[in-house]
């Protein structure tokens, strides 16, 4: 029996039931690779949710960036509210890797800002993979980087049970061993505090506090409590406290690692000296010996990840353990937008190694630092037992691996068909486009226009704006949050036309868009390939009046294939609608987003009130500031819960400033 409980307001429709049945059958038959070739708007995520629910195995859903991962995570959480749907992306708000530029003799130290909320979600994912079967982890490509050794992480967990005889001091020692720190003034993630016979622990994997009550040398009660109100949320008989960091090194392994690092250092010094690199040798010796002292004294040093191979006891060149190694053997991989995600997997290793080689050659790191790396593409696929690729335009690599196991999903549950495609000459294209836009504006519909260059997009934006069109330009410098706000404004009718160079990125499945215009469609290249054209045309595939206009003076092979595929799908859809007497219905999609929803907007109004209070903190009494901090903490946790990490970080910074003021005034 499956541990997943799928909840949806609707049943599979169109060719979804067939697709679900085929995918489930092949997974259960042991097929290593399959491809779900699903047209835009056909409900591919719902299909995959049904497959996961029926197969009943832990699943990893891989997305090519963190914004798309957040959207998928929110969708799957709606389908599986009673199961563990986890979010695993890089926990850095900011990351500047260590680097050296030989030409200018410039060394750049690693600088990073870790987002505590994302780190908590990463720990939540690994913890649930050990404790549950009903787990779906939605991850970005960062999941192929090293993540400690699962067996050591599990071995280091501290079991606590009501009635167990254990001295509180022993529990405190164990907590310190797994990298929790004592702070009797303030609780929080990765910290613990003691009040008499009560121990409060802030686990690394959730925002609730664990309260352990002792009676002498016996555990009397274990409870979850609210970190803000102190309210008891749940009483437990037993639980495990997992380490505060994924990288856990037992003391005996640390001693062996230090000896291995010393041996490698001596060998590398001889090599550098033999090559006449005396400055590099001196630099390496000074840096490494300092790191060794830190490891011996506190078990940690800055840049400790560069010694990961020794600390983990791996062989030179062997792949690091990563998130995949935390899954059980029968796990299922789903690669979303595989035509983008699969090539990304190939590129991660090479970029990392070129930077590390320069650091090693110039005496900043030992050669073993190169083994602190992401998985190579072939190493990743060796770990995968079963995989479903999901894309409207899967790549050749995915098609070849899937062989005959390609499942097509063309019919939309709403009956909406693929857009009509027209090819028009470039002469007079701007005036023709203006007339088409004006028609859409009168019908309160929206339009997307894609150009080949940034300059052309800017000029076209100015031209249309001068003629009274409400238009915006989406360019690469806009960050994820601003981008989503612009898309929300387009949906809400604040403007009618969106222009950009690359409109293939996430978040552009907009039901209000009835026109997609592709300028210079006959210029072969990255954004005018067959797959790119199909994807771009598909942006109008959610509207009952969808049309795509390709402005070109000749018919390229890519155009011909893209138009042919779109027309093939359109014929299938029209035939299905006619046979089943279906009238296409407009997609009614609430104007919300995984990152920016109506609830988020209303919460921002409250945020403005809090901003005023923060700005006037100097005028508040000592009794009022803690209350303000409590409100901000609640807002921060709500933001993090909704995957609004940038906003959560802003709350965190304001809380920090208020605490500094509070301490200063004491």
From Swiss-Prot:
Domain Helicase ATP-binding: 25-176
Subcellular location: Cytoplasm
Keywords linked to the UniProt accession: ATP-binding, Cytoplasm, DNA damage, DNA excision, DNA repair, Excision nuclease, Helicase, Hydrolase, Nucleotide-binding, SOS response
A single MF term (Gene Ontology): DNA binding
Positions annotated to bind ATP: 38-45
A biological process term (GO) from this entry: SOS response
This protein's domain notes: The beta-hairpin motif is involved in DNA binding.
Function field: The UvrABC repair system catalyzes the recognition and processing of DNA lesions. A damage recognition complex composed of 2 UvrA and 2 UvrB subunits scans DNA for abnormalities. Upon binding of the UvrA(2)B(2) complex to a putative damaged site, the DNA wraps around one UvrB monomer. DNA wrap is dependent on ATP binding by UvrB and probably causes local melting of the DNA helix, facilitating insertion of UvrB beta-hairpin between the DNA strands. Then UvrB probes one DNA strand for the presence of a lesion.
Self-association state and partner proteins as the record states: Forms a heterotetramer with UvrA during the search for lesions. Interacts with UvrC in an incision complex.
PANTHER family membership: UVRABC SYSTEM PROTEIN B
Protein name, per record: UvrABC system protein B
């Amino acid at each position: 029996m499956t541990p997943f409980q799928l909840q949806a307001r609707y049943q599979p429709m169109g060719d979804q039931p067939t697709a679900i049945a085929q995918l489930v059958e092949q997974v259960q038959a042991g097929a290593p690779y399959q491809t779900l070739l699903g047209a835009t708007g056909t409900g591919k995520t719902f299909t995959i949710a049904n497959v996961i629910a029926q197969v009943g195995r832990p699943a990893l859903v891989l997305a090519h960036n963190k914004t798309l991962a957040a959207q998928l995570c929110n969708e799957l959480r709606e389908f599986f509210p009673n199961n563990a749907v986890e979010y695993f992306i890089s926990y850095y708000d900011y990351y500047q890797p260590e680097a050296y530029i030989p030409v200018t003799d410039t060394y750049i130290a690693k600088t990073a800002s870790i987002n505590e909320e994302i780190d908590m979600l990463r720990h939540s994912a690994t913890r649930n993979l050990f404790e549950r079967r009903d787990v779906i982890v939605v991850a970005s490509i960062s999941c192929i980087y090293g993540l400690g050794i699962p067996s050591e992480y599990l071995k280091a967990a501290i079991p606590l049970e009501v009635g167990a005889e254990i001295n509180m001091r022993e529990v405190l020692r164990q907590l310190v061993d797994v990298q929790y720190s004592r702070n009797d003034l303030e609780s929080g993630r990765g910290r613990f505090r003691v009040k008499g016979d009560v121990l409060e622990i802030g686990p690394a994997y959730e925002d609730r506090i664990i309260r352990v009550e002792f009676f002498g040398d016996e555990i009397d009660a274990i409870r979850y409590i609210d970190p803000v109100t102190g309210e008891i949320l749940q009483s437990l008989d037993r639980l495990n406290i997992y380490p505060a960091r994924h990288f856990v090194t037992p003391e005996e392994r640390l001693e062996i690692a230090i000896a291995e690092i010393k041996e490698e250092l001596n060998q590398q010094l001889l090599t550098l000296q033999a090559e006449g690199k005396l400055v590099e040798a001196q630099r390496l010796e000074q840096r490494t010996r300092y790191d060794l002292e830190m490891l011996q004294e506190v078990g940690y040093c800055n840049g400790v990840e560069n010694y990961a191979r020794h600390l983990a006891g791996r062989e030179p060149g062997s792949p690091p353990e990563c998130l995949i190694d935390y899954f059980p053997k029968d796990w299922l991989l789903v690669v979303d937008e595989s035509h983008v995600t699969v090539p990304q997997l190939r590129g991660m290793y090479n970029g990392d190694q070129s930077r590390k080689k320069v650091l090693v050659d110039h005496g900043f790191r030992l050669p073993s630092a190169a083994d602190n790396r992401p998985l190579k593409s072939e190493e990743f696929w060796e770990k995968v037992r079963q995989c479903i690729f999901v894309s409207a335009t899967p790549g050749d690599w995915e098609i070849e691996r899937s062989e005959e196991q390609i499942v097509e999903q063309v019919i939309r549950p709403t009956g909406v068909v693929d857009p009509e495609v027209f090819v028009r000459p470039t002469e007079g294209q701007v005036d023709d486009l203006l007339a088409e836009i004006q028609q859409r504006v009168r019908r309160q519909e929206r339009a997307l226009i894609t150009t080949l260059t940034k300059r052309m997009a800017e000029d076209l934006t100015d031209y249309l704006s001068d003629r009274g069109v409400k238009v915006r330009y989406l360019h690469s410098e806009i960050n994820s949050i601003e981008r989503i706000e612009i898309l929300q404004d387009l949906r809400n009718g604040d403007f009618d036309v969106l222009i950009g160079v690359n409109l293939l990125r996430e978040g552009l499945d907009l039901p209000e868009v009835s026109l997609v215009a592709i300028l210079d469609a006959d210029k072969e290249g990255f954004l005018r390939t067959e797959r790119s054209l199909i994807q771009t045309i598909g942006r109008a595939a959610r509207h009952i009046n969808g049309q795509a206009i390709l402005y070109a003076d000749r018919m390229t092979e890519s155009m011909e294939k893209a138009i042919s595929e779109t027309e093939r799908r359109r014929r299938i859809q029209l035939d299905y609608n006619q046979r089943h007497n279906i009238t296409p219905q407009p997609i009614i999609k609430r104007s919300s987003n995984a990152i920016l929803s109506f609830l988020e907007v209303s919460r921002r109004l409250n945020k403005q009130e809090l901003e005023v209070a923060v700005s006037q903190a100097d005028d508040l009494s000592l009794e009022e500031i803690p209350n303000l901090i409590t409100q901000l903490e609640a807002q921060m946790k709500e933001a993090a819960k909704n995957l609004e990490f940038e906003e959560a970080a802003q709350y965190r910074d304001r809380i920090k400033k208020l605490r500094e003021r509070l301490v200063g005034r004491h």
